[in-house]
C-alpha cells in the first residue's frame, strides 16, 4: 500500500483511478455518476412564479449516497441558491432559494432517485437572503 502513495506523483492521469484506495475510487465513480445523471436530466419549461426560500430537512437513507452532491448539482442547474449539509443525526438539511416551481421540481427530482430513500421531508418557509450567489455543500 505504501508503494502506491510513493509512486502516485509519477502516475499518468488515466492511471489515477487505479491508484486510489477502493473507498476513494467508489466515491469518485459515484460522484461522476451523480454529475452525469444531473446533466442528462430533461428539465421542464418553468413559468417563473413566487420567489421564496425554504428550509428542508430530509430523513431516511440520505447520507453516504451522493445526496448532497446531487442536490447541489441540480439546484445549480435550476438556478437556485442556498446550501446543503449533513446533520449529526443522519438527516440532511438544506436552505433553497429561488422560484417556487423550480424548488418543487428539485424536491420531486430528489424523491425520484432510487438509491436515495427519503422517508420524511420537512419543508418550512424562511426569509429570502439578498445577494446570495450559488449553491454550496457545507
Say what each PLM segment does.
Residues 2-138:
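Intrinsically disordered, low-complexity, mixed-charge
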